[in-house]
From Swiss-Prot:
Glycosylated residue positions: 72, 154, 198, 212, 326
Tissue localization of expression: Higher expression in heart and brain, and to a lesser extent in lung, placenta, kidney and testis. Lower expression in liver, spleen and stomach. No expression in skeletal muscle.
Source organism per UniProt: Homo sapiens
Species classification: Eukaryota, Metazoa, Chordata, Craniata, Vertebrata
Role: Transfers N-acetylgalactosamine onto globotriaosylceramide. Plays a critical role in preimplantation stage embryonic development.
Protein name per Swiss-Prot or TrEMBL: UDP-GalNAc:beta-1,3-N-acetylgalactosaminyltransferase 1
Length: 331
């Protein structure tokens, strides 16, 4: 009886193993066939930025500003304008910035203005949301909005809108910064940094990314197709967490954008425009001014940075409140 049982068990186990083997082989065959069916492209090693350039400004965007009371600072001379990308429904994130690093409008007599960049949430947007955004803008006067869809893949359109708005409606700003709602900005340090610059023209800085490879894998957020970007390496560019530029570059970059087809990544797109304009990125001597990845910064470290990425709205409020206290830092 026992020997018969032992004879049956191995045969069942063998059958189970065979089933799993066949399943794995089927999956492997499927992926091989899928991969072979994909169009294959030769990655271009040597980058030619003129590949992206059109002599006529055929890529000039004609989206419309949609708010009735349009944001305008053409009659002001702000030292710094900070433009923050935001989603229409993310009121909490905007409010967190308004009561923390974006609240103070003057630092040592230098005017700093903060505005939020929005698109349209859906093709047929909810009327209540549209009205609430109008009310929010009437209350704070800090929203810039156009009628393109507000999606991750349209972030480049949002950046083009930012450059257009500064060029047309806020041309006197001495410096301009573009950042995101999940970034903690130490506004005081930013103003000090700009005041200590030796030059104020052809200046562009942030968290530099040099020889960054284009990603062709499965993760859609960071994937870019060969058709959209055929080169192996991206141009030198500054991460979208926060880049800063002098006034003279804004209209030049905006004009160049009309000649360069938008790509998925807005910061890379700006980098392409900079390379075509032959503008070099200024790399800060202090490598701890910009933090790209979320790290466990304490309050004393935040007192020394300009921008740190990866903060929730609640964390921005908490860290700002703690940073304002008279905590002694010994390092």
């Amino acid at each position: 009886m026992a020997s018969a049982l032992w004879t049956v068990l191995p045969s069942r186990m063998s059958l189970r193993s065979l089933k799993w083997s066949l399943l794995l082989l089927s999956l492997l065959s499927f992926f091989v066939m899928w991969y072979l069916s994909l169009p294959h492209y030769n990655v271009i090693e040597r980058v030619n930025w003129m590949y992206f350039y059109e002599y006529e400004p055929i890529y000039r965007q004609d989206f419309h500003f949609t708010l009735r009371e349009h944001s305008n600072c053409s009659h002001q001379n702000p030292f710094l304008v900070i433009l923050v990308t935001s989603h229409p429904s993310d009121v909490k994130a905007r409010q967190a910035i308004r009561v923390t690093w974006g609240e103070k409008k003057s630092w040592w007599g230098y005017e700093v203005l903060t505005f939020f960049l929005l698109g349209q949430e859906a093709e047929k947007e909810d009327k209540m949301l549209a009205l609430s955004l109008e009310d929010e803008h009437l209350l704070y006067g800090d929203i810039i909005r156009q009628d393109f869809l507000d999606t991750y893949n349209n972030l480049t359109l949002k950046t083009i809108m930012a450059f257009r708005w500064v060029t047309e409606f806020c041309p006197n700003a001495k410096y301009v910064m573009k950042t995101d709602t999940d970034v903690f900005i130490n506004t005081g340090n930013l103003v000090k940094y700009l005041l200590n610059l030796n030059h104020s023209e052809k200046f562009f800085t942030g968290y530099p990314l040099i020889d960054n490879y284009s990603y062709r894998g499965f993760y859609q957020k960071t994937h870019i197709s060969y058709q959209e970007y055929p080169f192996k390496v991206f141009p030198p560019y500054c991460s979208g967490l926060g880049y800063i530029m002098s006034r003279d570059l804004v209209p030049r970059i905006y004009e160049m954008m009309g000649h360069v087809k938008p790509i998925k990544f807005e910061d890379v797109y700006v980098g392409i425009c900079l390379n075509l304009l032959k503008v070099n990125i200024h790399i800060p001597e202090d490598t701890n001014l910009f933090f790209l990845y979320r790290i466990h910064l304490d309050v004393c470290q935040l007192r020394r940075v300009i921008a740190a990425h990866g903060f929730s709205s609640k964390e921005i409020i908490t860290f700002w409140q703690v940073m304002l206290r008279n905590t002694t830092c010994h390092y």
